[in-house]
Every structure is written in C-alpha cells, then in structure tokens.
Amino acid sequence: MSKKCALTGRKPRRGYSYAIRGISKKKKGIGLKVTGRTKRRFFPNMMTKRLWSTEENRFLKLKISAAALRLVDKLGLDQVVARAKSKGF
C-alpha cells in the first residue's frame, strides 16, 4: 500500500537517527557527542478516511495525511480535491 497522501502528495522522507552520549553543558558537562548515525525514514501521519463530497454527492474513501485532513477542515473537500487534481496527485 502506498505511503503517499492522495491530497497533498506528502510521502516518507529520509534522514538519520543519531546515537548520542555524554552530559549536556546545561548540566555542567562537557557536551553531547554524536557517536553514530544510522539511516531511517520519517513517515507522514497517514490514515484512511471516508469523506463526503457535496459535488459528487457521495463518500470518497481517501488515504490522506493529518495535514491534509486539517486542510479539508479549512477549505472544504471539493476545493482540496480540485487542487490535488490540478497538481497531479
């Protein structure tokens, strides 16, 4: 199953997970040192939702991110779907 948002196009990003040791300077230590880093992925907060479309007069079952859900609350589903279609998501 795809981990890409149907409305915003958000997808997993790549980054690093850092292994840290030492005592922080705030606690009067010498500071934190990075002893290693491993590759990891940051996933968007995805969920499957059934949303009512007034334009199509039916429910749409979409796999969307939490950010897209806030966008739907703000602008309305039909406007967000139109924007996604124009951008090609």
From Swiss-Prot:
InterPro entries named among the record's database cross-references: Ribosomal_bL28, Ribosomal_bL28/bL31-like_sf, Ribosomal_bL28_bact-type, Ribosomal_bL28_sf
Keyword Acetylation on entry: no
GO function term, MF aspect, one: structural constituent of ribosome
The protein's name in its UniProt record: Large ribosomal subunit protein bL28
Domain of life: Bacteria
Family: Belongs to the bacterial ribosomal protein bL28 family.
Record key words, sorted: Ribonucleoprotein, Ribosomal protein
Biological process annotations from GO: translation
Gene3D superfamilies: Ribosomal protein L28/L24
Signal sequence annotation: none
Record GO cellular component, one term: ribonucleoprotein complex
